[in-house]
């Protein structure tokens, strides 16, 4: 498409492609102050976490010789002989796709040939991560 390589490549469904040509960048000029948008992004991950941090359980006793203070409870009953679905366990926490709805745009700032869109709320993800803004 005679353009330089980009950092992100994203397909957006439900858009009339006749308005755009191959290799054309979509600038932030389409947004105006006071407009309401939906913001979609990937949240920050917390890695492998235990039951206390992941599910806010109380944990075990901390005194009188107990060494399992931050572990979870029983994995289940004797009868089904398996762990039932939905039972909380330690494991990977977060890193999921989140959409925040009805976020208003406060301002647009033009700085060094870049247009920054200032939103009224916090956004999901780390710095320099990809966000999708959907106009309502």
What are the roles of these predicted feature ranges?
Residues 1-136:
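Extended basic (Lys/Arg/His-rich) segments that typically form rRNA-contacting surfaces
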């Amino acid at each position: 498409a005679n353009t330089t390589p980009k950092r992100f490549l994203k397909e957006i469904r439900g858009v009339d492609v006749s308005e755009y040509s191959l290799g054309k960048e979509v600038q932030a000029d389409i947004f105006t102050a006071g407009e309401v948008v939906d913001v979609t992004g990937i949240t920050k991950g917390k890695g492998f976490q235990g039951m206390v941090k992941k599910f806010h359980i109380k944990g075990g006793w901390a005194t009188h010789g107990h060494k399992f203070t931050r572990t979870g409870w029983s994995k289940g009953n004797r009868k089904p002989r398996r762990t039932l679905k939905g039972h909380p366990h330690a494991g990977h926490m977060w890193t999921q796709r989140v959409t925040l709805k009805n976020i208003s745009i406060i301002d647009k700032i033009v700085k060094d040939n870049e247009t920054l869109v200032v939103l009224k709320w916090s956004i999901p993800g780390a710095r320099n991560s990809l966000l999708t803004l959907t106009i309502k």
